[in-house]
Amino acid sequence: MIRSAQRLLLTLAVVLVLPLSACGGSDEDDVRSASEDFVAAFKDENWEEVCSLMTDKSKAQLERAGQVLDANGGCEGVWEKASKFIGDKAKRQLDDFEIESVKVEGDTATVTTAEAKGQPTQLRKEDGEWRVDFES
């Protein structure tokens, strides 16, 4: 059970973090900024910032997954505990990712990268801010 939770959290980290980087245009600039902030916070292990850049539903889903790991401290506590299982190699991959495409439609955006191997990251505008949304 713990192994499956570890795999889930590693998969979430890869799916959420690797696909994020650059775009162009007004909403696209905002998506880019949110994406870059998310990646920087993840690399710095600034879990409070990482969680602030996630939708409320995404945080709730992460917290439910974290219950399997007995992670305390809400979203931040789950990321802190999960980071111990992610490993340095996965974290170093964040240094070498590149955006392939960005598509903004209303309050949702899709960001894809080569590193994500066909698994795009979704962002959603929530309270006027672009946030990572893995509930979509």
Residue ranges and their predicted role:
Residues 1-12:
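Bacterial N-terminal signal peptides that target proteins for export
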Residues 24-27:
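Bacterial signal peptide processing site
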Residues 38, 42-50:
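Short helix-adjacent coil turns
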